[in-house]
């Protein structure tokens, strides 16, 4: 897969926002995004800069809430990771947030480099000007484990849909911020079958894998070993490309 800090992945994620907004008639829309590494929601800010009528971008986090704390207090401080049922948010350094900081600081690369050095020592304070810029771009909210489980149950009861725990975090935070007359879109970031234990804990149902994925377990495995060497890897890629 492509790691979430990879720019190609961020570019691909911009499409979500255009598709969702177009389906709602290109009117002003709010988005709530389950957020760990900040890539998905950063893609939303790019979509807005491209002219999409996104009104609010809302960061949704679990108890590992460094982003929520940064946006509300201006302090970006590394804490202790608390394991949760939404593990993609179980981080303390959000790699794509550096990109948002770069824009908030007006593209001052030296300032961002200094902040990243301070982060290695435990954290830093965001300047007032940059913090104001970030707050104009993003809102945030956090939910607990109990609230996440409760939201999975609620959505199952209300709609019949089964959410993964990350998506449930997003919906829970979205409901804290929804306003009458403004569409609210929450990004569903994973299939519930990816987190069967958490879903079963919430609703007593173990979600099955989609048929096209379940069938993969019955197929033969093929493994190609390659030396830990750039040239060897390049040669293999070129060889496979021509087959």
Residue positions per predicted region:
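PLP-dependent amino-acid enzyme catalytic core
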Residues: 1-243
């Amino acid at each position: 897969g492509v790691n979430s800090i990879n720019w190609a992945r961020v570019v691909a994620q911009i499409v979500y926002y255009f598709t969702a907004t177009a389906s709602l008639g290109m009117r002003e829309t709010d988005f709530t995004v389950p957020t760990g590494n900040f890539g998905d929601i950063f893609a939303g800010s790019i979509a807005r800069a491209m002219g999409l009528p996104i009104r609010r971008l809302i960061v949704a986090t679990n108890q590992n809430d460094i982003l929520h704390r940064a946006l509300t207090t201006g302090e970006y401080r590394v804490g202790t990771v608390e394991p949760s049922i939404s593990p993609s948010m179980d981080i303390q350094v959000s790699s794509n947030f550096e990109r948002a900081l770069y824009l908030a600081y007006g593209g001052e690369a030296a300032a961002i480099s200094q902040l990243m050095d301070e982060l290695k020592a435990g954290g830093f304070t965001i300047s007032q000007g940059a913090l104001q810029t970030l707050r104009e771009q993003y809102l945030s909210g956090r939910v607990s484990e109990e609230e996440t489980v409760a939201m999975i149950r609620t959505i199952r009861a209300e709609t019949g849909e089964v959410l993964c725990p990350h998506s449930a975090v997003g919906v829970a935070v979205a409901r804290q911020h929804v306003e009458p007359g403004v569409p609210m879109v929450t990004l569903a970031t994973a299939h519930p079958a990816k987190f069967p234990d958490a879903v079963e804990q919430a609703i007593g149902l173990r979600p099955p894998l989609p048929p096209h994925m379940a069938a993969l377990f019955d197929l033969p495995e093929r493994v190609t070993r390659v030396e830990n060497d750039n040239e060897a890897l390049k040669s293999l890629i070129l060889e496979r490309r021509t087959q």
